[in-house]
Curated annotation (Swiss-Prot):
GO MF annotation terms: unfolded protein binding
UniProt KW keywords: Acetylation
Organism: Saccharomyces cerevisiae (strain ATCC 204508 / S288c) (Baker's yeast)
Miscellaneous comment text of the record: Present with 752 molecules/cell in log phase SD medium.
Name assigned to this protein: Vacuolar ATPase assembly protein VMA22
InterPro entries associated with the record: Vma22/CCDC115
GO cellular component, one term: nucleus
Compositional bias (Basic and acidic residues): 93-107, 114-125
Chain's role: Required for V-ATPase activity.
Length: 181
């Protein structure tokens, strides 16, 4: 009787070790993808800086940044089935600052007695679909290498969340395996 229980215990332990090896393999391959994405992004960024060296502002950097820009993506941390899961989601269209601006607009419209509804919907749409690369020169004047750099860096965002999830799952599996021994 104890031999069958021991065999079943070994089977579950073996499955957990196999799962750990699989998670480590996935973590390693995802880390290589992240490294490749960052490498490509920085190479393209250096190319765009090289082609932009003769401009008045110099390299693409903090001088070009629009400080009022609010990001489009947001990381959420949830607990599902006693596991901490990190997900990347799109930010909601309106933030607190925009709501305050709308309230101020309503007050000024009440004083004036006008209702420019078309202007509101157009400005709201622009804020929602704003591409941050436009702060580096507009639609037509952004170098293709800078666009490729943006694409490489955007591709890294889900990989980072995936790496965090793998790491959390590996840590919980290692804890359960150490408790069993």
């Amino acid at each position: 009787m104890s031999e069958t229980r021991m065999a079943q215990n070994m089977d579950t332990t073996d499955e957990q070790y196999l799962r750990l090896i699989e998670l480590l393999s996935n973590y390693d391959s995802t880390l290589e993808q992240l490294q490749k994405g960052f490498q490509d992004g920085y190479i393209q960024l250096s190319r765009s800086n090289y082609y932009n060296k003769d401009s008045l502002r110099g390299n693409y950097g903090e001088d070009y940044w629009d400080e009022t820009y609010i990001g489009q993506l947001m990381a959420t941390v949830e607990e599902k089935n006693s596991k901490v899961v990190v997900e990347i989601v799109k930010r909601k269209a309106q933030d607190k600052q925009e709501k305050k601006e709308e309230e101020d607009n309503k007050l000024t419209q009440r004083k004036k007695g006008t209702k420019p509804e078309k202007q509101k919907t157009q400005s709201h749409k622009l804020k929602q679909d704003y591409d941050p690369i436009l702060m580096f020169g507009g639609v037509l004047s952004v170098p293709s290498s800078l666009r490729q750099s943006q694409t490489s860096f955007k591709g890294c965002i889900p990989l980072i969340a995936q790496l965090i999830n793998y790491k959390n799952e590996i840590l919980t599996l290692v804890e359960t395996l150490s408790e069993q021994e």
